[in-house]
Design a protein with these regions (language model features):
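Glycine-/small-residue-enriched capping loops at alpha/beta junctions
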Residues: 1-110
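Phosphate/ribose-phosphate-bearing ligand recognition and processing surfaces
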Residues: 85-172
Length: 172
């Protein structure tokens, strides 16, 4: 699998699937979630509402992943996953790893060859970017997936540098 890094807007990526750092409600939130819903259009929200009614009445559990249309985005699908909130008092890194692992499993079910990930949980959920990069890269590399390209799309320079430094250190 090829792993690449881009500093930019995940909603601009022409890949098979874009991963959304969603909240439990699946009904749109802030950050990446808001941008994906805004650019993708009402089709994404309509499918999320249907998923809430039919499969996830209590919301999507942390670490799980589910796909919808990508609406007007350049991608074919959006894979929604709910990252954990960072807490120094409790190790939630297995849940963060689950976000990447389960998103890749959904991508495999869809037949996606290319997937773009944001830095899940590093915004309002306050996960330290260097640790998030390590978990993301370790998990993606260890995943048994048919996905040919994983692209990490980092919104700012700090995120981009954290991910590329982790990659070049060989620790991730």
């Amino acid at each position: 699998m090829k792993i690449t890094f881009v500093q930019g807007d995940i909603t601009d990526q022409a890949v098979d699937a874009i991963v959304n750092a969603a909240n439990h409600s699946l009904l749109g939130g802030g950050g990446v979630d808001r941008a994906i819903h805004r650019r993708g259009g009402p089709e994404i929200l309509a499918e999320c509402q249907k998923l809430r009614q039919e499969k996830y009445p209590d919301g999507l559990p942390t670490g799980q992943a589910v796909a919808t249309t990508a609406g007007r985005l350049a991608a074919r699908w959006v894979i929604h996953t709910v990252g954990p909130t960072y807490a120094e008092s409790k190790d939630k890194s297995p849940l963060l790893a689950d976000c990447f692992r389960n998103s890749l499993a959904v991508a495999d079910e869809l037949g996606a060859a290319s997937v773009a990930f944001p830095a899940i949980s590093t915004g309002v959920y306050r996960w330290p970017i260097v640790d998030a990069a390590r978990i993301a890269l370790e998990t993606v590399r260890a995943s048994d997936t048919q996905v040919a390209e994983v692209r990490f799309v980092l919104f700012d320079r700090r995120g981009y540098e954290a991910f590329t430094a982790q990659e070049s250190s060989g620790e991730g």
